[in-house]
């Protein structure tokens, strides 16, 4: 049976073997299934072979549903089209009934000859431009590209005959010569070009087999043919291998459980519609991680066990809950990529993650899906305790990535029966003085003009804005400005004043390019009042990169086991603190919010200052989530505010005069604050209204002490769930958990749930 299966794998026209077929396929596509393996057949992908948007066509033609089938590969025959000279594969599939589905086993190993054939084939590919396809009577390619495929020239100044066969075995004799550092094919090239009717974007593939030393030429068409091809006079017309009738017939036979054959020609990246079962099922496990606004990268799975090839990056714009799963992830690719904006969930992975469908571990499953420890061997099999944890802060470390500051917080979960009271941090002794840097700063958001049109210079907003930060200049004066970034690197930038405009000129473009500044990024200039040194930092407009999904998953499960863990916090959005002092949370329980109430957003700031009052809005709904207290209150803000409409109850307070202030003290009572004018380096890099400043700069706190954060005593912290409305960062998918009442199976009320966290304070 093994010999028969191997024979079926490459049983075709006798010329096209597996190595030649892969050479003619799209560069990062063309994965052929192994005979005898379990695969999923996607009807929509099959229809894509002749139609860019197959779903409406399939519905119009009444293709019977469903449109995805689990099958066994019965045969793979490799052929070449007589009209287009393209290699394609006829894949014969046997549908598998639901009751016949076996346990998931590893796919059969490809035949040993496959790897040997690929090593015995040398080839190069050239994509034809308009001059190659329409005007030139000869084919030219750099000598370095063709030296391993074309034979060496006997006489560099003369031409010699070169016999090349097409994929049907028909020989063509070219005039083979040299022109400078390029080799050329003439004479027969014009006839071959006319017979193939090349268009701009088509590719030709020249191949040489080492065993017989014969040359072959194949063609890869750009996606679909825009016009019918002219037929060679010496050959009868042959219809295209993929037709509408074939797709309809294949879908009907698959639905009836009958064997069928599908034609696959690889023209674009990631167009495989016969996908190994294990790849799809692993991708299904990873699918729950994806949410809009996440940054992902396209990943191609290659042949012969090769590691996956990483493609362009992009951001998820939408996830479509399509019935048959085909191309359900919509992605906005960066860098002008021509990739299809609709991708399959097994073809993408999160940026910075090693997870991919063919080799990715399963993500942590929800309590409803945790049926045995075998499903997630590295995770606890018991139900998770909830989405919020009472913790003690043991350390806060400050660092920078690409000149943007972030904080790494070390937390130790506290069991409910060991709840601790907030304690004041120990006063530093005389041997460990606390260093506080006084800074003056200003911030400028980069417009399109700053980031694109005039990126060779930086316009200072106003002279008064930079006063105290940048040096004073006279008209037409320019001085070198020595300024350090957040990594300590010193930059020398020319600072000048011309025609009432202060600007940074020479040297600025180096900083902008090194940090890849884009429209919407904020540049923060700071000057130390003590040392006089100047600093330059950034606040990015894109999603945080230091925070990976793996980090959040690990934090959730370590917190569930009451083990120490670390979280990364990067401040880019107002009110996005997910580690909140317990005193702030239980003080907020005094508030009584109702729909229609007018409230202010209030930012809690560092250094015991008065809270900053933000925009005014109206409460329109109060959610009572079963397992979370994160962003429970929905507020209608003015359109100009740009605020997230879902807020936490400790972030708002009732507007004075509308109702009693004492009943809605959501952050901290005002008498708990005293103004402090100093601002440190971390404060300057935070958002304009002072949300989330860290008081201690690069200081670790011992486990026996507490830490002052947001101007409050911070011993335990509560990291709740991030918002999923599109304004959150990468931690919006996996969040922390809240206790359930497991005795009676009922979901406790919000106050009951908080009482379990703060039993002595409520």
Curated annotation (Swiss-Prot):
Keywords: DNA-binding, Nucleus, Repeat, Transcription, Transcription regulation
Record-linked Pfam families: B3 (PF02362)
Subcellular location: Nucleus
GO cellular component: a single term: nucleus
Gene Ontology molecular functions: DNA binding
Keyword Protein biosynthesis: no
Domain of life, per lineage: Eukaryota
DNA-binding region: 124-223, 443-542
SMART domains xref list: B3
GO process annotations (BP): regulation of DNA-templated transcription; response to hormone
The name this protein goes by in its record: B3 domain-containing protein Os07g0183300/Os07g0183600
Gene source species: Oryza sativa subsp. japonica (Rice)
């Amino acid at each position: 049976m093994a010999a028969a299966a191997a024979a079926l794998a490459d049983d075709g026209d006798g010329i096209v073997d597996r190595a030649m077929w892969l050479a003619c396929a799209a560069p990062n596509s063309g994965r052929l299934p192994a005979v005898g393996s379990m695969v999923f057949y996607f009807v929509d992908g099959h229809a894509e072979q002749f139609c860019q948007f197959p779903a409406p066509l399939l519905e119009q033609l009444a293709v019977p549903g469903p449109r995805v089938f689990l099958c066994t590969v019965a045969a793979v025959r490799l052929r070449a089209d007589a009209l287009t000279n393209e290699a394609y594969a006829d894949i014969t599939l046997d549908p598998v009934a639901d009751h016949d589905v076996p346990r998931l086993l590893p796919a059969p190993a490809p035949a040993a000859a496959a790897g040997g054939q690929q090593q015995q084939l040398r080839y190069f590919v050239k994509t034809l431009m308009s001059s190659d396809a329409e005007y030139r009577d000869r084919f030219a390619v750099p000598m370095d590209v063709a030296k391993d495929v074309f034979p060496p020239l006997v006489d560099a100044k003369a031409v010699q005959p070169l016999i090349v066969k097409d994929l049907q075995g028909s020989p063509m004799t070219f005039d083979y010569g040299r022109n400078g550092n390029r080799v050329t094919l003439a004479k027969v090239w014009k006839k071959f070009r006319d017979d193939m009717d090349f268009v701009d974007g088509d590719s030709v593939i020249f191949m040489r087999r080492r065993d017989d030393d014969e040359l072959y030429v194949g063609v890869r068409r750009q996606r679909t043919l825009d016009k019918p091809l002219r037929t060679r006079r010496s050959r009868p017309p042959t219809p295209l291998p993929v037709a509408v009738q074939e797709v309809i017939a294949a879908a009907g036979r698959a639905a009836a459980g009958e064997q069928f054959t599908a034609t696959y020609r690889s023209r674009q990246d990631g167009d495989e519609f016969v996908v190994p079962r294990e790849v799809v099922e692993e991708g299904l496990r990873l699918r729950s991680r994806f949410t809009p606004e996440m940054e992902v990268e396209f990943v191609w799975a290659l042949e012969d066990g090769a590691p996956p090839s990483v493609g362009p990056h992009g951001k998820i714009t939408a996830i479509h809950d399509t019935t048959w799963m085909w191309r359900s992830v919509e992605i906005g690719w960066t860098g002008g990529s021509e990739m299809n904006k609709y991708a399959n969930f097994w073809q993408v992975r999160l940026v910075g993650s090693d997870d991919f469908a063919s080799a990715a571990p399963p993500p942590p499953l929800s309590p409803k899906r945790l049926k045995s420890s075998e499903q997630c061997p590295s995770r606890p099999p018991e139900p998770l305790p909830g989405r919020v944890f009472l913790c003690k802060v043991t350390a806060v470390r400050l660092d920078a990535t690409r000149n943007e500051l972030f904080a790494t917080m070390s937390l130790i979960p506290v069991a409910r029966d060991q709840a601790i009271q907030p304690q004041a941090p120990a006063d530093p002794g005389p041997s460990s003085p606390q260093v506080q840097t006084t800074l003056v700063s200003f911030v400028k958001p980069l417009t399109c003009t700053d980031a694109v049109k005039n990126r060779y210079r930086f316009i200072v907003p106003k002279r008064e804005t930079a006063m105290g930060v940048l040096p004073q200049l006279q008209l037409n004066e320019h001085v070198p400005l020595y300024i350090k970034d957040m990594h300590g690197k010193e930059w020398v930038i020319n600072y000048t004043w011309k025609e009432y405009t202060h600007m940074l000129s020479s040297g600025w473009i180096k900083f902008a390019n090194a940090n890849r500044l884009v429209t919407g990024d904020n540049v923060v200039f700071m000057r130390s009042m003590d040392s006089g040194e100047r600093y330059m930092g950034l606040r990015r407009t894109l999603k945080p990169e230091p925070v990976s999904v793996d980090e959040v998953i690990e934090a959730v499960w370590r917190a569930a086991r009451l083990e120490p863990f670390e979280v990364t916090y990067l401040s880019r959005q107002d009110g996005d603190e997910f580690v909140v002092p317990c005193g702030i949370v239980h003080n907020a329980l005094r508030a009584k919010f109702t729909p229609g109430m007018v409230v202010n957003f209030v930012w809690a700031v560092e250094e015991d200052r008065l809270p900053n009052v933000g925009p005014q809005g109206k409460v329109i709904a109060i959610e009572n989530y079963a397992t979370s207290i994160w962003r429970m209150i929905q507020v209608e803000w003015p359109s100009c505010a740009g605020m997230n409409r879902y807020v936490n109850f400790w972030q708002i307070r009732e507007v004075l005069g509308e109702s009693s202030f004492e009943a809605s003290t959501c952050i901290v009572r005002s008498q708990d604050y005293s103004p402090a004018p100093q601002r440190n380096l971390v404060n300057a890099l935070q958002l304009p209204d002072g949300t989330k400043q860290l008081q201690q700069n690069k200081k670790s706190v011992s486990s026996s002490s507490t830490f002052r954060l947001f101007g409050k005593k911070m011993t335990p912290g509560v990291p709740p769930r991030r918002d999923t409305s599109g304004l959150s960062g990468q931690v919006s998918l996996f969040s922390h958990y809240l206790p359930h009442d497991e005795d009676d199976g009922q979901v406790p009320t919000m106050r009951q749930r908080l009482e379990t966290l703060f039993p002595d304070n409520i």
